[in-house]
């Protein structure tokens, strides 16, 4: 099963989403020190004035998980979602390199985003343990407290 590889970009200085959709990666040209986001349409250069004021550390790239919430919204790293299993709680989506998977962090416990569950009289099936995107760690950090 494949999923689209795409990112969204948070500008930490301006505290807003960088005005580009579906960034696939951030590229640094080491010869000219120019930064650009690579998109399906080609490179999207970052203005030199932006580069001089923070460079790579200014941006947070958050990858699409390939999953949608109950409202059909895409779920990205950094999103805060409502967890419905084993109990209702808010959790942050993050990428875990050790398991090479997206996970949920709630109350300092890492949870899988999908679990196997058997409903009486039916075969076991994969089900999401989240319901909907509540916000994200940049604009709504209070949702995790």
Predicted features and spans:
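Secondary-structure transition motif
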Residues: 1-145
């Amino acid at each position: 099963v494949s999923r689209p590889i795409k990112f969204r970009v948070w500008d930490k200085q301006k505290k807003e989403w960088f005005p580009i959709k579906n960034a696939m990666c951030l590229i640094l040209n080491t010869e000219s020190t120019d930064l650009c986001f690579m998109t399906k349409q080609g490179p999207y250069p970052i203005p030199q004035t932006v580069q001089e004021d923070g460079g790579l550390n200014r941006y947070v790239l958050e990858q699409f998980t390939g999953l949608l919430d109950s409202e059909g919204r895409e779920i990205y790293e950094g999103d805060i979602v409502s967890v419905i299993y084993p109990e209702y709680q808010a959790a942050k989506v993050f990428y875990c390199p050790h398991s090479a998977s997206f996970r949920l962090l709630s109350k300092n416990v890492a949870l899988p985003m999908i679990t196997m569950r058997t409903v009486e009289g039916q075969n076991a099936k994969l089900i999401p343990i989240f319901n909907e995107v509540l916000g994200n760690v940049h604009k709504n950090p209070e949702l995790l407290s």
